Structure formats: structure tokens, C-alpha cells
A protein has these predicted regions:
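Hydrophobic alpha-helical connector segments
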Residues: 1-31, 83-90
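Short amphipathic alpha-helical interaction patches enriched in hydrophobic/aromatic residues
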Residues: 1-3, 24, 43-46, 97-101
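Hydrophobic alpha-helical bundle segments that form small-molecule/ligand-binding pockets
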Residues: 5, 45-49, 57-83, 123-124
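Residue-level recognition of alpha-helical structural elements
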Residues: 9, 31, 49, 79, ...
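Amphipathic C-terminal alpha-helical segment
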Residues: 23-26, 70, 90-107, 120-124
Length: 124
């Protein structure tokens, strides 16, 4: 979805996260994010796993940052902060919302994340 050629960068980002909400709901909020799970459970026990999880988050954040930068270039997202900073913040927020959704067995935290992220954090 992040590379969909017919959607604007902003629309691609929004649809991407809305799709992740649907996946979490379909899985009944079980399992969560593999990277997040490894980070929480194993990063202190294995330096190799910690390094790979860190690289995974960096790669994911860079993918999001690339789309944010496109949206900034098109005036769809403010240029007040670097795309990399916004992407890291958005990804960290998503991971927190996903943990809360798992605990509450509810999509409300994920929907709140999407609403606030796209109304405020990634606003023009």
C-alpha cells in the first residue's frame, strides 16, 4: 500500500495504517507485531535479536519516512519536522496503540491513533 501508484502519498499512509487496523481486528488483537513482540520479550536476552529487531524497526521507519517526505514535497504534510522524525514518532505511536489494543481487545486505541496521527501529527 505504501507504494500504490494511483494514490497520493498522504492517502497511501492513511490506507496503510487503516489496513493494519483491519488486520489486527481480524486477528482479534492476538499476536500483535512480531518486531514489537521480539523487542519486548527477547531484546535483553540476545544481542543478535536486539540488533535485528532494531534494524527491522529502522527499515520500517525509513519506508514510512520516504512516503512522508513525498507528502511533504507535495504540500500534504507540514515540513516543520524532518520526515525521519515524524516517521519514528508515528511508528512508536503505532506500537504503543497496538499494545493497548491487545490488552483491551479493542480497536479503539488503533482508531484513536489513526485519527490523531492524520488529523494532527501528519497534517499539512
Amino acid at each position: 500500500m505504501l507504494r500504490h501508484p494511483k494514490l497520493s502519498p498522504y492517502a497511501r499512509l492513511r490506507k496503510y495504517f487503516e489496513g493494519l487496523v483491519q488486520v489486527a481486528e481480524k486477528k482479534e488483537f492476538r499476536g500483535g507485531c512480531l518486531l514489537g513482540n521480539f523487542a519486548a520479550e527477547l531484546s535483553e536476552q540476545s544481542e543478535m535479536i536486539r540488533a535485528r529487531v532494531s534494524k527491522g524497526f529502522s527499515t520500517w521507519s525509513a519506508m514510512i519516512a520516504n512516503v512522508i517526505a513525498e507528502a511533504q514535497a507535495e504540500g500534504q504534510i507540514s515540513k516543520d519536522l524532518p520526515a525521519s522524525t515524524l516517521a519514528a514518532f508515528v511508528l512508536n505511536g503505532w506500537e504503543g496503540a497496538l499494545v493497548r489494543a491487545r490488552v483491551d481487545k479493542s480497536k479503539a486505541p488503533l482508531e484513536q491513533f489513526v485519527k490523531v496521527t492524520f488529523a494532527k501529527t501528519l497534517a499539512p
